[in-house]
Regions:
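Low-complexity, intrinsically disordered Gly/Pro/Thr-rich segments
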Residues: 405-406, 412-422, 561-569
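Short, glycine/acidic-rich beta->alpha junctions
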Residues: 206, 293
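Beta-rich carbohydrate-recognition and catalytic domains
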Residues: 12-36, 42-104, 113-203, 216-290, ...
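Secretory targeting and sorting signals
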Residues: 1-11
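Hydrophobic, lipid-facing positions within transmembrane beta-strands of outer-membrane proteins
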Residues: 36, 107, 160, 210-212, ...
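Lectin-like carbohydrate-binding module/patch detector with strong preference for beta-trefoil
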Residues: 439-583
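Repeated scaffold domains used in trafficking and secretory/extracellular systems
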Residues: 38, 295-300, 355-362, 402-409
């Protein structure tokens, strides 16, 4: 038996803060999306690194020329963040003439730590894949014509491509590795597709590349990405798309497909692209058709516990705008449906809503096999405990509100998820969420009066989701729960003082249900987002403690009788407010 075994506060900040806030400096595009698309990775040292698009006007050039991607770091498990470095465009990091046209390191960073050696790249190397480009000619032309002009949306950059960088010193310095794939003109994509066209874009082309996603598979590095080049179809045997011979000059389809390339880490070039999601086939007239209708985009992909692969993406041709596909082989998604199924078709447990839609889906696999999903339409996440493609999903609240391009980062060392999010007017925010089974000791809290322990009636998620919007924390016989984890709790010290009880089954806090700290109020599971679930530990006798409400110091956590719901009550000496923590 332990008196008060607690988890340290240093690496826990559930409500989070700000990584970056746009100031008054001018932007190359609309201010609402001037800073967007945060992504992160964890290094072997434990450091977290993050990057995001920051499309402010480069002071030295007055344009997008010399734009960089910022790298920020956290050395305390995501609790605080500081600037670390800036990754320059290939033209300014390399003297190789092949990279001279790529003068802007623009957007869609994807950070990835190599889990094994790939060719000349050692295990543990930090990689960055990003969208690079030439200057924004639409911006330059409009500023030249009217110095007072202010952009309100995306512009038109030339020479768009996806570049690969590496760092061997935890993100401090960077080298260009190579160019993964090339596109053409941006053409206003994706906020003003085919509208914001520069005069220099003679044929009004819209052929950018977007959203790289890296992983290692069978000894090779794989880069998934979104491709707006114009393709007239693909080889059904190999999945290799057929580029329109008039891609650079013909009327643009404004379509997009999902593809991937592979690289062995030694060869000069990556493989040919292979289709993952082709989208609809569109009639371009004159007997020509092109794939890419519906603009599938933003690949995320994970292995599942039943030896399959689950891919999620956004889709804009009507019906479900956030979709998924399942494959036995992560390199052969082209063999299935060109449009996939809506994520709302995935099974959920009672009380949980269908998986969020709204585009920009994010999917991660935790070390224990659980799958975690989020999309732009909700601040909540959905967890598949089995990790199987036929597993059911359960909804959990988070402290990070809904937003475009959120990022979910599992943190080795805490077992929690750090969420990065674009909020409001180009604010990159961070928060943390506990989804259960996080690092540290769990204990049962035994009530002195009844001998029973604190449980949740087998509910593992927020009580408003999993218990019919009714508080669920109550006394139970030890070992009586069908899900044993629901009777175990972290006692976590908070940075502002006090402790929180976080349940092992889902990481939810034992909190005052109404938020009003008055006598008689019940206790229910809720995401750890306020002081309603924070307690002051007061030592009692014989190894017991009392848990005093931080919100109202006259009230204590109380189990009045056997099987009773937990409530807040004024101080009493009958043992109903005394608790012993037992492993």
């Amino acid at each position: 038996m332990l008196a008060i075994p607690m988890t340290a506060a240093q690496a826990y900040n559930p409500t989070g803060g700000t990584v970056y806030q746009l100031g008054s400096e001018p932007c190359l595009k609309g201010r609402f999306n001037c800073a967007v698309y945060p992504k992160s990775a964890q290094l072997p040292s434990g450091r977290l690194v993050a990057s995001f698009e920051k499309s402010t006007v480069v002071t030295a050039t007055g344009s997008a020329d010399r734009q960089t991607l910022p790298i920020h770091k956290s050395d305390d498990d995501g609790t605080t963040w500081q600037p670390l470095s800036e990754v320059k465009a290939p033209a300014y990091l390399s003297t190789d003439p092949r990279y001279a046209k790529y003068t802007s390191n623009w957007t869609n960073p994807f950070l990835y730590v190599l889990p094994e050696r790939v060719g000349d790249l050692k295990a543990g190397t930090l990689l960055l894949a990003s969208v690079v480009s030439g200057d924004d000619q639409y911006y330059k032309e409009h500023k030249s014509a009217d110095p007072n002009w202010t952009p309100s949306n995306d512009g038109d950059r030339g020479d768009m491509a996806i570049a690969l960088y590496s760092s061997t010193d935890d993100g401090v310095t960077w080298q260009v590795v190579n160019v993964v794939a090339t596109g053409g003109w941006q053409g206003g994509s994706a906020g003003a597709v085919g509208q914001n066209i520069a005069s220099a874009n003679k044929y009004k082309q819209v052929d950018p590349l977007w959203e790289p996603y890296l992983m290692v598979h069978r000894g090779k590095l794989v880069c998934y990405y979104s491709d707006e080049n114009d393709y007239i179809g693909f080889d059904p045997a190999t999945g290799v798309p057929r580029l329109d011979p008039a891609n650079d000059t013909a009327k643009d389809s404004h379509g997009q497909i999902l593809v991937h390339k592979t690289w062995n880490g030694k060869s000069k070039k990556w493989s040919e692209p292979v289709v993952d999601i082709a989208g609809l086939t569109e009639d371009m007239g004159g007997g020509k058709t092109e794939i890419g209708g519906g603009r599938p985009g933003m690949t995320t992909i994970v292995p599942t516990a039943d030896d399959k692969w689950l891919l999620t993406y956004e889709y804009w041709a009507g019906g479900a705008n956030t979709r998924y596909r399942i494959s036995d082989d992560p390199l052969k998604f082209f063999r299935g449906s060109p449009t996939g199924m809506g994520v709302d078709a995935l099974p959920v447990v009672a009380g949980s809503r269908p998986l969020a839609a709204g585009g920009s889906p994010v999917l991660v696999r935790l070390p224990d096999g659980r799958l975690v999903y989020n999309a732009a339409g909700s601040g909540n996440v959905w967890v598949n405990d089995s990790g199987r493609t036929d597993g059911v999903w359960k909804e959990y609240q988070t402290t990070s509100r809904a937003g475009y391009s959120r990022n979910l980062q599992y943190v080795e060392g805490t077992g929690r998820i750090v969420i990065l999010n674009n909020q409001g007017t180009s604010t990159i925010a961070h928060a943390e969420v506990d989804l259960g089974d996080s690092a540290g000791a769990y204990q049962q809290l035994v009530n002195r009066k009844t001998g029973q322990v604190i449980g949740t009636g087998n509910n593992s998620t927020d009580a408003n989701i999993g218990n019919g919007d009714t508080p669920d924390v109550a006394l139970e016989d030890a070992g009586a729960a069908a899900d044993p984890d629901t009777q175990y709790w972290h006692v976590v010290t908070k940075s502002g003082g006090g402790v929180t009880l976080l349940n092992k089954s889902g990481g939810r806090a034992a909190a005052i249900w109404t938020g009003n700290a008055t006598a008689g109020q019940r206790i229910g599971q809720w995401v750890d987002d306020s002081t309603t679930g924070t307690w002051t530990v007061v030592r009692s006798t014989n190894g017991h403690v009392k848990l005093q409400s931080v919100r109202n110091k006259d009230l204590y956590l109380t189990g009045a009788s056997a099987d009773a719901p937990l409530t807040l009550q004024n101080a009493t000496t009958d043992g109903s407010q005394d608790w012993k923590l037992v492993r």
